[in-house]
C-alpha cells in the first residue's frame, strides 16, 4: 500500500464534504472544551452540513465522477453522491428540531452535535464503501453514534432503556453481518473489494461443488446463500424491515424525538445505499432467488407496518411502524434494479426526508408545549394552534400519498417502476397498504380538526398558544415551515428531479461496476 497514493490530493478532494464535517466536529469539540459556551455550536454544525450538501450537489452535476478512491476502498458515482447528499440534508434539518428540545430536556448540546456529525460521517462513508473492512468500520461509526444518541436524555429511564435495547440488538445484527462477510472473504479466496469478491467467487471450484440443485435447477453456492442471509439480517435491521424491525417501536418511543427523526431518515438512507451496492454487485449469481426473498421482506414490511400502525395510540410509535412500511416501499426500487428504480428510490427518499422530519418537528413542538405524544391528546389542536395542526396534517397526508402532495408523486413513480418490472404483487400491496395508512393518518388529522370545545383534550385546553407561529424566529418552526413547503410543492418538480438523478447515474456508470 503506497502512502503517497492513499493520501493524494485527488483522494482528499473526493471526500471534501466529509473533511468539512470533520473540521466542524473538531471545532465544536475545542470550543466546548475551552469556553463551555454553546451559543454558536448549532450554527457551526448547520453551516458545515449545508456546505457539505452544496459541495455534493456540485459533484453530482460534474460529469467527471465515477471512479474509486483510496486504493479502491471508496466508490464515487452519482448514486453514492446522491445518498451522501440525502444524509447531510437530513442531519441539517435535524439541528433546528433539536435546539429547543436540548435546552428544555437538559441534554448536552455539544455532545449531541458531535454524535450527530459522527453518525452522519459514518453514514456518508458507508454509502461509498467499496470493500468489506470499510463497510464494517463505517457501519459501526454510524451504529455506535446512534446508540449513544438514543440515550442522550440520561435522566429519562425510557431513553436509557431505548439505548440499551438498540445497543444489544444492533450488536447482535452487526455480529451476524460480519459473519456473512467472513463467508464472502473465504469464498472469494481472500478478497475484500466488492468487485474482486465476485470475480473470486466465480473462479473458485467451491462455488460449483457446493451448488444446490432441485429438480435440475441450480440455486447457487450454499456458502453464498449463508453469506446472503447473514447480510440480509444486518441490513434489514438497519432499515427496519420485517422481520428485523423489533427494535424500532421501543427505540423510537424512548429516544429523544430529534434523535428519532435522524434515525428514521439518515440511518435508513445509509442502509438502503449499502443494500443496493451489496446486492447488485456481490450476488448476481443468485439474483433470481434473492429477489424472491427480498419480495417477501418487502411484502411483510408493507403489510405488517401499516396494520400495526393503525392500532397505535402513541404518535412516535405510530411513526415507527409507518417507517417500517416505508422500508417496504423502498425495497421495491432495489428489486427493480435499473436506473429508473434507483432514481425513484432517491427521489422518494428526498421527499420522505421532508415529510417525515416535518411530522417529527410537529411532534417535538407539541411535546415541548404539552409533555405528551399520545394521539388522543391532539384532539382540538386546530382551535389553539391552527398552523401546527395544518403543518402536521400536510406532512401526514403526504406520507399517506394523498394527491397533490409530494408523497403522492413519489409513490406514483416508485410504483410505476415496480409495475414496469412486473412486480405486480408488490405494487398492488403497496397501493392497498397506502389506503390502509390513510386510516391512521386521517385519525390524527380528524382529532386535531375537531371544532367542538367540549371534545378538546385536557392538554390542548392548557396549551399555550404562540403569537406568530408561521413567521416565528424559532429555529424549529422555521425548519417545520421548510418541510411543509417541500412536502406540498416538491411533487410538482418530479420530472426535473428524476431526470437529474437518472442522468447522474448513467453518466457516472453506476450500473456498470
Swiss-Prot record:
It is a multi-pass membrane protein. It catalyses: a plastoquinone + NADH + (n+1) H(+)(in) = a plastoquinol + NAD(+) + n H(+)(out); a plastoquinone + NADPH + (n+1) H(+)(in) = a plastoquinol + NADP(+) + n H(+)(out). GO terms for cellular component: chloroplast thylakoid membrane. GO terms for molecular function: NADH dehydrogenase (ubiquinone) activity; quinone binding. It is an enzyme of class 7 (translocase). It is found in: Plastid, Chloroplast thylakoid membrane. Its EC number is 7.1.1.-. It comes from the Eukaryota. InterPro entries: NADH-Q_OxRdtase_suN/2, ND/Mrp_TM, Ndh2_N. Pfam families: Ndh2_N, Proton_antipo_M. GO terms for biological process: ATP synthesis coupled electron transport; photosynthesis, light reaction. PANTHER family: NADH DEHYDROGENASE (PTHR22773). NDH is composed of at least 16 different subunits, 5 of which are encoded in the nucleus. HAMAP family: NDH1_NuoN_1. NDH shuttles electrons from NAD(P)H:plastoquinone, via FMN and iron-sulfur (Fe-S) centers, to quinones in the photosynthetic chain and possibly in a chloroplast respiratory chain. The immediate electron acceptor for the enzyme in this species is believed to be plastoquinone. Couples the redox reaction to proton translocation, and thus conserves the redox energy in a proton gradient. This is NAD(P)H-quinone oxidoreductase subunit 2, chloroplastic. It comes from Staurastrum punctulatum (Green alga).
